[in-house]
Amino acid sequence: GATEVVATDVTDQTLARVRQVGADHTVNVATHPDGLDGYKADKGYFDVLIEASGNAQALRAGFDVLKPRGIIVQVGTGGEISIPLNVLVAKEFDLRGSFRFHEEFALAVELMNKGLVDVKPLISHSLPYTQFEEAFALAADRHQSMKVQLTFA
């Protein structure tokens, strides 16, 4: 497992929620653009980068804090982006794509059902399915929500 988890985002609400589920440190890169500078020393600090936003700037910032021969797992799908191949090659990064964790879905459901993983802190809103339009509008606004749940009971 990871010995230290650092999460970045542009909203304080999201960062507060990831602290609840175990992040050791959080950085709001919108209000503290130099918040990762301490991790840049000695060619990088982290062994693994999981980029979940699909944002080109987020991926590029990760290049600066990832150790040589580090692993980048790209989960976010933001369309076409440009990456500095010179850095990718010079630091010998291993860049991997991961699409929605298809293989892990059944395991994730099992862990939640057994109470071994608590996702409740990640759910910012829970609405009855009859309010699906409001739920989708909330889900589309990252400044208002993190994860929106529809209930059917």
Predicted regions and their residues:
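Conserved beta-strand positions in the Rossmann-like core of class I SAM-dependent methyltransferases
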Residues: 5-6, 73, 96
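Rossmann-fold NAD(P)-binding glycine/threonine-rich loop
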Residues: 76-92, 103-110
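Glycine-centered, small-residue-biased loops immediately flanking beta-strands
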Residues: 70, 93
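C-terminal hydrophobic helical "lid"/dimerization subdomain
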Residues: 12, 20, 60, 102, ...
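Adenosine-nucleotide cofactor-binding segment
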Residues: 1-61
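Well-formed, non-transmembrane alpha-helical positions, independent of function
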Residues: 17, 61-64, 86-87, 138
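Short strand-turn motif at the edge of the Rossmann-like AdoMet-binding core
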Residues: 75-79, 98-100, 123, 127
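Helix-to-beta-strand junctions that scaffold the AdoMet/dcAdoMet cofactor pocket
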Residues: 66-68
